Every structure is written in structure tokens, then in C-alpha cells.
Amino acid sequence: FKRFFKNKTLNRLVLASVLLAFAQSLTGGLFVIFMDSILELGDYASRAIFVNFTFAVIGIFLWRYISLKYTKHFAASLCLLYAGILFLLQFFVVLYISDASETVKAGVLFFILAMYGISFSGAAPLIISMVADVSDAEEAESDINKSGAMFAYYTTITKVGYTFAVAFPYIFLESVIGFDISLGSDNSQFTK
């Protein structure tokens, strides 16, 4: 297990996975608050998540195709760039539509979530596939199959990203910003 800490390629993939886990869990953890408190579309939250995950399934085929045509690294990088641009773009769109009717806000939101959903399924499977490649290279070098231990190492450390993403935003919102989750859209304009 100690040898994994010295494997730079594996640790880069683990770091990428931790950051991805944090980012995806952070957006997921804050989604209901965002829908209810910011957009005041709480009734649409479950349908919006359904749209997001439906397009995530569709996205699997796109990212697999790109990874086969080019490389896994390129496909994962492109996927993360695409997700990052859409994530930033959505903030400007939300500011633009904040005073629109409920129907317009819901329609625009569903479109953005569909486009963002395409990226949701891309990077994680590609990173796991690259970890499998590292495991195969390690086995070829040492003639010992360590794939189980390597994936245990990868999965355990990746869970750190999920853990921080669940705890950090709520602590920050309540302790630093003063946002009260129980108030929903009745929070002050500053805390929203």
C-alpha cells in the first residue's frame, strides 16, 4: 500500500477524482437550496434532477466515443472543461432570468441542466479507467496483481472529496454567511 503513495500517475488520478467528487457533490448538495431559495422553483427540483441524470446517461456514450477516438486523458480534460464553462455560465444565466416568470426560469434551468448533465458521467468513469491502466502497468512491472488494493486506495481517498463537499458548504453558509436553510427563500438578499 505504501508503494501507491509514491506512484505519481496514480496520485494525480486520485487527486483529480477527489476534486471531481468534491465538485459534483458540492453542486448536488447545494442543488435543492439553490432551487428553493434562489430560483424559488422548489417544486421542480426532482424533475430537474431527473433531466440532469437522463442526459448524464446519454453523455456516457459521447465521452466514451471521444476517449476511443483520441485518449482517455483528452476526453476527461475536455469533459471537465465543458462542465466548468457551463457551471460558470449558469451563474450569469441565473442573474439574467432571476426576475422572469416561473415557466421561463424552469425551461431555461432544464435546458442548462440537460447540457450540464452530459458532462456529469464523463470524467469519473474515464478516471477509473485510467486507474485500471495504471494497475495493469504496475502488474506488468511487478508481476503481482494489485488491482484490488489500488482501487481500494483510490476509492477510500476519493471519499474524502465527497465528505468535505457534504459538510463544508452547510457549515460555511450557516456560520460565515448567516444563511438559514430552514428559511428557504425568506433569507435576506445578502445571504442569498
Please give the residue ranges for each predicted region.
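Membrane-embedded alpha-helical bundles of multi-pass transporters/translocases
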Residues: F1-K192
